[in-house]
UniProtKB/Swiss-Prot annotation:
This is Transcription elongation factor GreA. Keywords: DNA-binding, Transcription, Transcription regulation. GO terms for biological process: DNA-templated transcription elongation; regulation of DNA-templated transcription elongation. InterPro entries: GreA/GreB_C_sf, TF_GreA/GreB_CS, Tscrpt_elong_fac_GreA, Tscrpt_elong_fac_GreA/B, Tscrpt_elong_fac_GreA/B_C, Tscrpt_elong_fac_GreA/B_fam, Tscrpt_elong_fac_GreA/B_N, Tscrpt_elong_fac_GreA/B_N_sf. GO terms for molecular function: DNA binding; RNA polymerase binding. The keyword Transcription regulation applies. It holds the Pfam family GreA_GreB_N. Necessary for efficient RNA polymerase transcription elongation past template-encoded arresting sites. The arresting sites in DNA have the property of trapping a certain fraction of elongating RNA polymerases that pass through, resulting in locked ternary complexes. Cleavage of the nascent transcript by cleavage factors such as GreA or GreB allows the resumption of elongation from the new 3'terminus. GreA releases sequences of 2 to 3 nucleotides. Belongs to the GreA/GreB family. Gene3D superfamilies: Transcription elongation factor, GreA/GreB, C-terminal domain, Transcription elongation factor, GreA/GreB, N-terminal domain.
Length: 160
């Protein structure tokens, strides 16, 4: 018997997935169904690009709906209060600097479904997060890089 994959995420992340799911079901799915019906009215489906395009989009949307349902159903909501205030954990925001003297950087550590490095959210599965998790303010950690080298960082601040 296979175990379902658990998707760790914040309550905010789950809410965003739920909103996307609702949009797909209530807005996008009916729009695509309508486009398919209109395209069918054009006759021969074998050379009907509007029909093929709508069917392709329908397949994508239905697949995304199934994926979102599974992710929401198997969501493990992260409680940043479950660990000490100064300990890095999922759902917390950590400020660190690369040693010896780089500028501080701040990222929230979130589940992989929510990661968006450009928005300051890194996946708990990333090398940086793995190195920082369960460490405390003042700790210095080594973060492996894809090149095989590593960088040293110091944790400056942890926030919920």
């Amino acid at each position: 018997m296979s175990e379902e994959k658990v998707f760790p995420m914040t309550a905010e992340g789950r809410d965003k997935l739920q909103a996307e799911l609702e949009d797909l079901i209530t807005r996008q799915r009916p729009e695509i169904t309508n486009r398919i019906q209109i395209a069918r009215s054009y006759g021969d489906l074998s050379e009907n690009s509007e029909y093929q395009s709508a069917k392709d989009e329908q397949a994508f949307v239905e697949g995304r709906i199934l994926t979102l349902k599974k992710m929401i159903e198997n969501a493990e909501i992260i409680d940043p209060n479950a660990t000490a205030a100064d300990v890095v954990s999922l759902g917390k925001t950590v400020t660190f600097k690369e040693l010896p003297d780089e500028e501080p950087e701040t990222y929230a550590i979130v589940g992989s479904t929510e990661s968006d490095p450009l928005a300051g959210k890194i996946s708990n599965e990333s090398a940086m997060a793995v190195a920082l998790l369960d460490k405390k303010v003042g700790d210095k950690v080594s973060v492996p890089l894809p090149s095989g080298e590593s960088i040293d960082v110091e944790i400056l601040k942890v926030e919920k």
